[in-house]
Amino acid sequence: MIHRCTYIGSLVVLILALVPVTGCSPAIAPFSGCAYELAVDLKVDALRTMERAEEPFSKHEPRVESLQRQMKKAVEFARGRPNNSITTRQWEIMMNPEGHMVGGFLTRWKQDDSLSWGFIREASAQIEAGFDAIIGLESGKIGSK
């Protein structure tokens, strides 16, 4: 019984010793004005591009490719920042071509050539909420004003 108490006591001391060390390092990246602006710009560009999905995909392919390229830049920017795995994961979900966000929407548009207004409206609301989550996470980081 004495050994167990000593072990638990040592564990408590170790945890208390580590608290100041881990408490000083941020668990999430600080605010980045560049990341915030990029997310807002991509939200606007994505929703404007989606509005055109009633028309043939081929008519808007250059615009779609530009949007995809900009989103890849956003995920690479997020990935390159220390302690930014949550935001990086949000961008990966947003871009997933098999998912239900921008990547999946663009894949479906390309496959079907055009989409119904009802589908576009529903998808836009979901995707807008996804962008708002990314923007909200960034604006809530330490250092934002």
Where are these regions (language model features)?
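Bacterial N-terminal signal peptides that target proteins for export
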Residues: 1-13
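Immediate post-signal-peptide N-terminus of mature secreted/exported proteins
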Residues: 24-58, 62
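Sec-exported extracytoplasmic/periplasmic mature domains
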Residues: 47-54, 69-79, 107-110, 132-143
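Acidic helix-start/capping segments at beta-turn-to-alpha-helix junctions
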Residues: 60-68, 88
